[in-house]
Amino acid sequence: MAHAGGGSGGSGAGGPAGRGLSGARWGRSGSAGHEKLPVHVEDALTYLDQVKIRFGSDPATYNGFLEIMKEFKSQSIDTPGVIRRVSQLFHEHPDLIVGFNAFLPLGYRIDIPKNGKLNIQSPLTSQENSHNHGDGAEDFKQQVPYKEDKPQVPLESDSVEFNNAISYVNKIKTRFLDHPEIYRSFLEILHTYQKEQLNTRGRPFRGMSEEEVFTEVANLFRGQEDLLSEFGQFLPEAKRSLFTGNGPCEMHSVQKNEHDKTPEHSRKRSRPSLLRPVSAPAKKKMKLRGTKDLSIAAVGKYGTLQEFSFFDKVRRVLKSQEVYENFLRCIALFNQELVSGSELLQLVSPFLGKFPELFAQFKSFLGVKELSFAPPMSDRSGDGISREIDYASCKRIGSSYRALPKTYQQPKCSGRTAICKELDHWTLLQGSWTDDYCMSKFKNTCWIPGYSAGVLNDTWVSFPSWSEDSTFVSSKKTPYEEQLHRCEDERFELDVVLETNLATIRVLESVQKKLSRMAPEDQEKFRLDDSLGGTSEVIQRRAIYRIYGDKAPEIIESLKKNPVTAVPVVLKRLKAKEEEWREAQQGFNKIWREQYEKAYLKSLDHQAVNFKQNDTKALRSKSLLNEIESVYDEHQEQHSEGRSAPSSEPHLIFVYEDRQILEDAAALISYYVKRQPAIQKEDQGTIHQLLHQFVPSLFFSQQLDLGASEESADEDRDSPQGQTTDPSERKKPAPGPHSSPPEEKGAFGDAPATEQPPLPPPAPHKPLDDVYSLFFANNNWYFFLRLHQTLCSRLLKIYRQAQKQLLEYRTEKEREKLLCEGRREKGSDPAMELRLKQPSEVELEEYYPAFLDMVRSLLEGSIDPTQYEDTLREMFTIHAYVGFTMDKLVQNIARQLHHLVSDDVCLKVVELYLNEKKRGAAGGNLSSRCVRAARETSYQWKAERCMADENCFKVMFLQRKGQVIMTIELLDTEEAQTEDPVEVQHLARYVEQYVGTEGASSSPTEGFLLKPVFLQRNLKKFRRRWQSEQARALRGEARSSWKRLVGVESACDVDCRFKLSTHKMVFIVNSEDYMYRRGTLCRAKQVQPLVLLRHHQHFEEWHSRWLEDNVTVEAASLVQDWLMGEEDEDMVPCKTLCETVHVHGLPVTRYRVQYSRRPASP
């Protein structure tokens, strides 16, 4: 069959499900069976299709239904027998039983109440039963296709005939899905033929003959040879008469084929069931109502055949069973009153949106005429033929073409000539083969080598990939790409104009040559057609209209009627325009080339379009503060939800991979600050000290001499580019964390930095790893560090891109050198040779120094920003966008530095850091950080008090493997701080004394009397051992401390926190101290049984003595009786069982009580 069925469509939608798409709101509730509506053949076919699909996996049930119909037709059973057997056969499918009511005679009806028992209604008298029985036979036989009873035809043959008829009708319905009028006309032909057969029963036949039916169907299916051939199997006699010309009319469009040679036995076989007229039994005369319209019983409350047909169509178009079940689930939500009608339309719009007819029918069922929220999608399906082919399983070429299956019957084409039937060695990649387009496609298709040029394509069809099926999202074109597209469009339009004009000139020149060879009399008689002597009517007309405008029709008419006079004039004008336009093209080429050169590099860079705007917003102070606050809020939310333990972890982490970039960043900032008249000279000196001494100390970098750094910056600015030092060549080892920095006591004093004598450079040594610096900063310092890190990261990107391009250039040069040596010719750049590319003014080795010089020029205003960006694009191509806002970034950093040197809080932050660094509280070795915990806590507390009105940031600089990692953490300073300075000093001193070692008591026994923390026995052992150690020390026999710790495992990992507001200490979970000797666990396992036995014996001895002193014999006996359940008074009957087991080698008695039932009371 042509579809995959929809058996559950009726049950899914028309079942007994309360308020649903059936019943009063969905279907049409019938009356008690006193009125019948006309039933059509498609209703019967739809019902049979439902039965076949529902029992597709159970053919015995379907064949049983066909057998019931056969027996009913032969009057072997009556109408109640049919009802009873059909009800038993479909007892698990109430929708099919209710649907069967449509074919029952008047007065009969099957109802299914809520209790599930069948309620069969029938006429009251037997006479009515007999008449209705005859009616029912006629009624059902009118609707259900069948065959005449032949005893030699088996039941299986009947099933095949039914299947063939249903499959054929469904095939027609699918084929002409886009032309429903053809399908309706076909059904009308069947209705007319059957009705005439009934009306002429018992009288001379005056209706349509089989030959007339076949002729009308052939005219209806013009061009559909496969459908007509299959229809001929149902009317073999009529088809044969038409083919042989003996019928009432001949079909000239249908040619003879293999059906002309019909075997003899096929002529004698019974007529198939599709068009067989209905005949009454010959031996029993009945009261017939055949002259009236057919009637249908009132349809039950579970749905109508129209609804069943709708769901069958939905299942066929959705194809996937899973998708169809999801569609039914949406309707189930509506049945359960969980969604409204409008919401149901929204739910089913993804399923039915591509099928407007089904969607409109669905809305009509709901009573909704119009869907305002989502217009249905246009149906993009192809013709009916393409729906019958599974292109997914067909052979393919690429992603756009599929091969038709070999079983596919080609449509008839009347426009092909003999050349189309030659050897099949060429093919065309075209998907059109119909009558109207064959010849046009034959002319305009492209040929593929390897196949014969004389054959049209009948195999490969175009298989489109819809844009909405693709997940690729194309980016929006930039303005520079649009400019390139406009240039290409203009060039294309001009080329089309020139080529059109040139083609017209060639055509008219050929006409002029032809006229020159004619006699004068022939020239006067010569006329041109609409093509004006060429092969196209359009090209010449366009060229003439372009030149003459409104006068073009007159010129064209003159060329046709008087070509001798008109052709030379028009040809001269065309050639003049050709020269004029060629000269204009040369001028346009220069303009287009300039536009290409300006927009080409810009069009390649998609990120630079929005980078400057977004970067300006991202580098604002508010954006930087919002970034870390959002991370802080996220951590707090995770902690409050219990997803993470409260811990001190950084909110932002940045990596400085190359510390040499710090010098370049400092040089750029100093260069800009030095040339700002708004910054006072004193502030400039302080800024230089921060950049060249304070900041490098945070990053464990070399501290530069101020005077030398400024002179080197000026020399680099004034020196030629070829002598600028590379950052990689200027690298020097950085000092370690313990190297003595220059005297920082007067770093922010009144004396300018240039007056201080230069310090000797420190001795180079290998930088240490796992060292850190701790710095508590306020908002302004946080902004500066973030901007400084952004500047360094962008400088590093530019530097690495320059190194990468240099490496690629050298690799390419080596490859070209090897190739040139093999060919023995000089290698050169083709773009250079063609003068399409100008040599770069900057060598690749100098790209990074040249970039720094351009940034300096941009900062001082000696270079235009547009020129700066274009030069960067030429140097770094699509990676240059990171340097476009370098001037704005340096200006923001200079503005923050001015705040740092002019704000008192910022200066106090630096002074506090320098003081704490001298105390060892601002960094050191990472492994000994626990030693500095108290001092760092004190430093943090002082910093929070200093920045009471601002945010406090904990910034750590960690040096590891040649890199510096900067972490930033926003601290919570909202807890109440004490205002009493005496109490504050006392707390700081207490914390430092508690955690530190220098404040510990010298005597181990001091303070133990108030709250002893040791057991007395351990304390005694310690005193004896301590005295012996002192005696050995006096004799010089004491062991060294490391010998005493041999074989001892220990760890000091306990962590604690102090609440400054409450002076309470809180220990951190999963942190502890431990110490034990190696081998003690093994020895403990060996001696454990002995220790347990000794403890058990001690306990037994103590217990025996206690019993003798405190318990009498009678009391012990009573307790023993009670325990064993032998005491009867006020006790539930029970019995105690004693079991002796051994636990760790010791006998242990276990008691278990078993309760018995209490005897029933009298």
Swiss-Prot record:
Stretches the record annotates as Interaction with REST: 59-105
GO BP annotations, alphabetical order: negative regulation of cell migration; negative regulation of transcription by RNA polymerase II
Keywords, comma-separated and alphabetical: Nucleus, Phosphoprotein, Repeat, Repressor, Transcription, Transcription regulation, Ubl conjugation
Record keyword Transcription present: yes
Compositional bias segments (type: Basic and acidic residues): 253-265
Source taxon at top rank: Eukaryota
Comp. bias (Pro residues): 755-765
Modified residues (Phosphoserine): S709, S712
Region (Disordered): 1-29, 246-284, 706-765
Region HDAC-interacting domain, residue ranges: 446-572
Residue numbers spanned by region Interaction with SUDS3 and HDAC1: 392-591
Primary location group: nucleus
An annotated GO cellular component: chromatin
Transcription regulation among keywords: yes
Annotated segments matching region Interaction with CRY1: 1-308
Subunit structure: Component of the SIN3B complex, which includes SIN3B, HDAC2 or HDAC1, PHF12 and MORF4L1. Interacts with FOXK1/MNF, MXI, MAD, NCOR1 and SAP30. Interaction with SUDS3 enhances the interaction with HDAC1 to form a complex. Interacts with CRY1, HCFC1, MAD3, MAD4, MAEL, REST, RNF220 and SETDB1. Interacts with C6orf89. Interacts with MYT1L.
Function (record text): Acts as a transcriptional repressor. Interacts with MXI1 to repress MYC responsive genes and antagonize MYC oncogenic activities. Interacts with MAD-MAX heterodimers by binding to MAD. The heterodimer then represses transcription by tethering SIN3B to DNA. Also forms a complex with FOXK1 which represses transcription. With FOXK1, regulates cell cycle progression probably by repressing cell cycle inhibitor genes expression.
Protein name according to UniProt: Paired amphipathic helix protein Sin3b
Organismal lineage: Eukaryota, Metazoa, Chordata, Craniata, Vertebrata
